[in-house]
Amino acid sequence: MTVEERSNTAKVDILGVDFDNTTMLQMVENIKTFFANQSTNNLFIVTANPEIVNYATTHQAYLELINQASYIVADGTGVVKASHRLKQPLAHRIPGIELMDECLKIAHVNHQKVFLLGATNEVVEAAQYALQQRYPNISFAHHHGYIDLEDETVVKRIKLFKPDYIFVGMGFPKQEEWIMTHENQFESTVMMGVGGSLEVFAGAKKRAPYIFRKLNIEWIYRALIDWKRIGRLKSIPIFMYKIAKAKRKIKKAK
């Protein structure tokens, strides 16, 4: 099958990435409606933060790829703040890990199947174990994320499992590239890149304390506890510069 066409939700263009101006509650309803309609297409959800937007601005193929998603939601306060600066305010930030958890709640109620693809074998096994304890009505299966994009062996295994959800935790751009490379081999499936969420569910990494999330500075906490992320912080000022440049361009056009 193929990916559901872009939703008719109002769009907000942030440096070429077409975000859906939606809320967590609306996204939950969208996912429930997708299953209720029994569509044979797939629902591809991208949760984009400033780092992803930055990457997309310099990688045209990736930009075109994610703009084909059924929904693109703002995973990052930087994206929401940028939308306000550009006078196209997004309604809410929708953290990917929280949207994944909402999907799992739906799957639990409906006794659905979930495939976890990503991280190391040890981490994805631990994530599945932890989630199985929390959501016993879900049928889980998993595979580590250290595979080539063209690896058909894993695809065949997933097809045999017939999941309702495939959560891909390979990090961008690989997770979105994997989804769009293989999505036509699945049907009636919600597919979403979830970055490091599997590591959080596995207990290998901790999510930021509530106060960091409340203040919308979760990214600072992640950088403080994971030195590998320090180098990635440079994407924040680059993103801010690009937004300022886009704002000046809009002013000149008026």
UniProtKB/Swiss-Prot annotation:
| The enzyme's E.C. designation | 2.4.1.187
Q: Which reaction does it catalyse?
A: UDP-N-acetyl-alpha-D-mannosamine + N-acetyl-alpha-D-glucosaminyl-di-trans,octa-cis-undecaprenyl diphosphate = N-acetyl-beta-D-mannosaminyl-(1->4)-N-acetyl-alpha-D-glucosaminyl di-trans,octa-cis-undecaprenyl diphosphate + UDP + H(+)
Domain of life of the organism encoding this protein: Bacteria
List, in alphabetical order, the GO biological process terms annotated in this UniProt record. Answer: cell wall organization; teichoic acid biosynthetic process
Single GO MF annotation: N-acetylglucosaminyldiphosphoundecaprenol N-acetyl-beta-D-mannosaminyltransferase activity
Pfam families, per the entry: Glyco_tran_WecG
Free-text disruption phenotype from the record? Not essential. No teichoic acid in cell walls.
Which pathway does UniProt place it in?
Answer: Cell wall biogenesis; poly(ribitol phosphate) teichoic acid biosynthesis
**Keywords recorded for this protein, A-Z:** Cell wall biogenesis/degradation, Glycosyltransferase, Teichoic acid biosynthesis, Transferase
State the top-level EC class.
Answer: transferase
Function of the protein: Catalyzes the conversion of GlcNAc-PP-undecaprenol into ManNAc-GlcNAc-PP-undecaprenol, the first committed lipid intermediate in the de novo synthesis of teichoic acid.
UniProt lists the family membership as follows: Belongs to the glycosyltransferase 26 family. TagA/TarA subfamily.
Which PANTHER family does the record associate with it?
A: PTHR34136, UDP-N-ACETYL-D-MANNOSAMINURONIC ACID TRANSFERASE
Q: Under which name does UniProt file this protein?
A: N-acetylglucosaminyldiphosphoundecaprenol N-acetyl-beta-D-mannosaminyltransferase
